[in-house]
């Protein structure tokens, strides 16, 4: 580029460099989209806009991609590196420029015909200033229409710092030429497909238009389901129809979001400023799969795990910066206090009560509102656990909202609904101290402005945040596979509850929890906490801690928990240095070196972070525990031990493997543990390697408390085969509390009611107990003997003496 064009673009770039601060999506386009910079690249933009072109250029230069203003020279022909699909609107509409895109596409395809070695990568790119979806019955949706020069000037002036450059996966023109030919008709088709691509992409970025709130309420009131519920309300409460209708409107006011793009923009600025000071980084993985779903027109339901109140803001912030529409979020009614409630409502929150029981009008209004969100095409987010995890483990799912999601599908007419499980991880959770108090029996504080301000005042260094998108679950595909007759239940008016609904919802919920855990994120804090809590003194020398982290990292890298889980790329030493900056640990120096200590008062709190990744390490920990206690064991015996205990572990930690997969998992882990030198293999027997016994013992400690808990329940069951389920749960907790006091077990989940409830249910499902109350004494005692061999003699004595003293 030379002469007048260069001067023109330099002059135009002066105001843009001041007004525009754009963001690239994805953050590293060449790496994430697999662009090969050694091969020719050309860019395709939706319409002729020099401002868009220069904004694209800035991002290309920042990411070491070819300059779009530099033409491509191919076989002596000089072609522009960018193509505008449409000439774009003009201030003076009587002038209509000639469309150039088809000619340029044809020129490029023609070069591929004459040069079989040529392969140009065509990269569609859209540049957006502002993301306002607009209102129904309003003017044309600004982000979805092309802007002329004057309109563009005002858009850039006002929205230049809320702009992004969205790179799409490249299209190989070589493949196009080979599969479809190179004539002009193919060039026209290419231009037409590109137009459709950009229209879909913009809809995915801004979402459908927003209704006027009153219009939405009027539509809901006119629905047959709510009209019938209003009549029932009037009849059952002996009130007038108008009063019952006012009750319905009051419930809509309580529930419905009041989405505001301006509030999203303002909050984005505030959060961007805040995150940069509180977090050292927010790590996002597998966002491209969600962008593709949105582009393909799926109705997306985000289903994250729930660690903290911060989840609401963090996930919306991440989605917004991934070029996606922030979802409508189901938030607990406890958050509907001033000023948080009105703010959350404008950020897309709709509020849900803890229970729907006994209020048919409320459940009908909520279900119809949720169905309306789906039918209008808004993305939705809800926490399937129902509340924040106090232990750091996933809670058993609450299936009410999930059930309503499937019922919305049974109304017909919605786009394909896809559930997207999300793992959210932190190196510091601001509520973790409160969680520990609640687990010890303290009453949960009601959310309020003073409590919120108190929490905000404590925010300091929060380390790294992690948002990992798991494997999506298309509901239609799932139902087609598991309930082929589901379409027979479609009813556009009534909320249908076919016989298959409850078991199917339970199965989907369990699958979602497994997929959330599959996307787990190991980090410096949860790895260091796992190692230090494994030591009975909660302290290790720096060398021992480094060695233990190397063990965990090698296990996770060489035998990954799943393809969606993430492990830090940093070395053990770097992770320890980072964790020490979080001020959770103490370092004592002596003449030999550093000792890293987890203070007693911090130990209970740090179990939360250990539990975040307990599922990722439980299998190697269990194997290490079995090998450590037996000193030597055959592969077959090891597998028998693991298979006997696995159903309880799978239910408790939502593990991913089926029973038939265990043999290959055990083999892979045994090979890795042997490679690390922790064990040796002699005559198909696994032996402890005495020179690395400490590392193996610390690895085994990850399963120690779980095995002790199982031993308690199996001992009680074998001692009293006719014990009923509720008594078994209660007595197991009592013994666990005694054990935690006598043996210094600091984990709050050790005697958590939900953990024992889940365990007893699994024992019923596995046939150890039945609803008639009779256990299988021989089988129960066999498992207890196996567990008794895996726990220390003093713990075993405490468990067995607990029942003898009664």
UniProtKB/Swiss-Prot annotation:
**Membrane topology qualifier:** Peripheral membrane protein
Please tell me whether the keyword Lipid biosynthesis is annotated for this protein: yes
Q: Which UniProt keywords apply?
A: Acyltransferase, Cell inner membrane, Cell membrane, Lipid biosynthesis, Lipid metabolism, Membrane, Phospholipid biosynthesis, Phospholipid metabolism, Transferase
> Motif HXXXXD motif: residue span?
305-310
Report a single Gene Ontology molecular function: glycerol-3-phosphate O-acyltransferase activity
Where would you find this protein in the cell?
Cell inner membrane
Primary localization: membrane
Q: Where are the transmembrane segments?
A: none
This entry's Enzyme Commission designation comes to: 2.3.1.15
Q: Which InterPro entries match?
A: GPAT/DHAPAT, GPAT/DHAPAT_C, GPAT/DHAPAT_LPLAT, GPAT_PlsB, Plipid/glycerol_acylTrfase
Its Gene Ontology cellular component terms are: plasma membrane
Asked if the Swiss-Prot or TrEMBL record annotates the protein with the keyword Nucleotide-binding, the reply is: no
Q: In which pathway does it act?
A: Phospholipid metabolism; CDP-diacylglycerol biosynthesis; CDP-diacylglycerol from sn-glycerol 3-phosphate: step 1/3
Q: Identify the SUPFAM superfamilies for this entry.
A: Glycerol-3-phosphate (1)-acyltransferase (SSF69593)
Q: Which reaction does it catalyse?
A: sn-glycerol 3-phosphate + an acyl-CoA = a 1-acyl-sn-glycero-3-phosphate + CoA
GO biological process, alphabetically ordered: CDP-diacylglycerol biosynthetic process; fatty acid metabolic process
What is recorded about the domains?
A: The HXXXXD motif is essential for acyltransferase activity and may constitute the binding site for the phosphate moiety of the glycerol-3-phosphate.
The family classification in the record reads: Belongs to the GPAT/DAPAT family.
* Protein name per its UniProtKB record: Glycerol-3-phosphate acyltransferase
What organism does the UniProt record list as the source?
Answer: Salmonella paratyphi B (strain ATCC BAA-1250 / SPB7)
């Amino acid at each position: 580029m030379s002469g007048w064009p260069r001067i023109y673009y330099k002059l135009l770039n002066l105001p843009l460099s001041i007004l525009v601060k754009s963001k690239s999506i994805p953050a590293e386009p060449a790496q994430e989209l697999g662009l090969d910079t050694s091969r020719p690249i050309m860019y395709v933009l939706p319409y002729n806009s020099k401002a868009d072109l220069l904004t694209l250029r800035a991002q290309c230069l920042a990411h070491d991609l070819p300059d779009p203003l530099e033409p491509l020279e191919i076989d002596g022909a000089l072609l522009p590196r960018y193509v505008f699909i449409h000439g774009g609107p003009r201030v003076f509409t009587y002038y209509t420029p000639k469309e150039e895109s088809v000619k340029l596409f044809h020129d490029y395809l023609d070069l591929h015909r004459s040069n079989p070695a040529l392969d140009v990568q065509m990269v569609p790119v859209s540049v957006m200033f502002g993301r306002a979806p607009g209102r129904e019955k309003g003017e044309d949706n600004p982000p979805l229409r092309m802007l002329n020069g004057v309109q563009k000037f005002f858009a850039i002036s006002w929205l230049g710092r809320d702009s992004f450059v969205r790179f799409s996966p490249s299209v190989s023109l070589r493949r196009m030429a080979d599969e479809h030919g190179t004539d002009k008709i193919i060039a026209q088709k290419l231009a037409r497909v590109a137009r459709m691509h950009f229209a879909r992409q913009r809809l995915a970025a801004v979402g459908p238009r927003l209704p006027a709130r009153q219009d939405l309420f009027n539509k809901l009131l006119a629905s047959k389901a709510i009209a019938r519920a209003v009549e029932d309300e009037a009849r059952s409460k002996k009130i007038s129809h108008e009063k019952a209708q006012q009750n319905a409107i009051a419930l809509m006011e309580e529930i419905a979001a009041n989405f505001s793009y301006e509030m999203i923009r303002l909050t984005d600025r505030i959060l961007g400023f805040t995150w940069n000071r509180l977090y050292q980084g927010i790590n996002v993985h597998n966002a491209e799969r969600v962008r593709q779903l949105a582009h393909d027109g799926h109705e997306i339901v985000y289903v994250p795990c729930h660690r903290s109140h911060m989840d609401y803001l963090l996930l919306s912030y991440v989605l917004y910066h991934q070029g996606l529409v922030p979802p409508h979020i189901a938030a607990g009614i406890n958050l509907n206090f001033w000023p948080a409630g009105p703010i959350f409502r404008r950020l897309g929150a709709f509020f849900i009560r803890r229970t729907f029981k006994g209020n048919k009008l409320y459940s009908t209004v909520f279900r119809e509102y949720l169905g309306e969100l789906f039918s209008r095409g808004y993305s939705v987010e809800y926490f399937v656990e129902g509340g924040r995890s106090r232990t750091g483990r996933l809670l058993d799912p609450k299936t009410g909202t999930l059930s309503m999601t499937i019922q919305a599908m049974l109304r017909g007419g919605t786009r394909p609904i896809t559930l997207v499980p999300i793992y959210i991880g932190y190196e510091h959770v601001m509520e973790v101290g409160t969680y520990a108090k609640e687990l010890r029996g303290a009453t949960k504080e009601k959310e309020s402005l003073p409590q919120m301000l108190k929490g905000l005042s404590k925010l300091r260094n929060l380390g790294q945040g992690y948002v990992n998108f798991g494997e999506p679950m298309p509901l239609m595909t799932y139902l087609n596979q598991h309930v082929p007759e589901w379409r027979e239940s479609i009813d556009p008016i009534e909320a249908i509850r076919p016989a298959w609904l409850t078991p199917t919802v339970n199965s989907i919920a369990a699958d979602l929890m497994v997929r959330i855990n599959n996307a787990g994120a190991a980090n410096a804090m949860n790895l260091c906490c796992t190692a230090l809590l494994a030591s009975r003194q909660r302290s290790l020398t720096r060398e021992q801690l480094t060695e233990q982290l190397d063990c965990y990292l090698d296990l996770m890298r060489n035998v990954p928990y799943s393809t969606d889980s993430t492990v830090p790329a940093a070395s053990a030493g770097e992770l320890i240095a980072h964790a020490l900056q979080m001020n959770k640990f103490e370092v004592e120096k002596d003449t030999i070196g550093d000792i890293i200590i987890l203070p007693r008062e911090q130990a209970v709190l740090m179990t939360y972070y250990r539990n975040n990744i307990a599922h990722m390490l439980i299998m190697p920990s269990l194997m290490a525990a079995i090998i450590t206690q037996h000193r030597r064991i055959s592969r077959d015996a090891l597998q028998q031990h693991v298979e006997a205990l696995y159903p309880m572990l799978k239910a408790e930690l939502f593990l991913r493997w089926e029973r038939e997969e265990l043999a290959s998992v055990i083999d892979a882990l045994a090979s890795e543990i042997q490679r690390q030198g922790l064990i040796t293999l002699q005559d198909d027997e696994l032996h402890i390697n005495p020179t690395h016994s400490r590392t193996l013992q610390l690895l085994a400690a990850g399963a120690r408390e779980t095995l002790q808990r199982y031993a308690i329940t199996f001992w009680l069951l074998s001692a009293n085969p006719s014990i009923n389920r509720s008594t078994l749960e209660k007595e197991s907790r009592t013994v666990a509390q005694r054990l935690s006091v006598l043996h210094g077990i600091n984990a709050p989940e050790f005697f958590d009611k939900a953990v024992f409830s889940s365990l007893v249910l699994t024992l019923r499902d596995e046939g150890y107990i039945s609803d008639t109350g009779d256990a299988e004494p021989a089988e129960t005692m066999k498992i207890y003997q196996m567990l008794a061999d895996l726990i220390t003699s003093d713990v075993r004595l405490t468990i067995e003496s607990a029942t003898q003293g009664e």
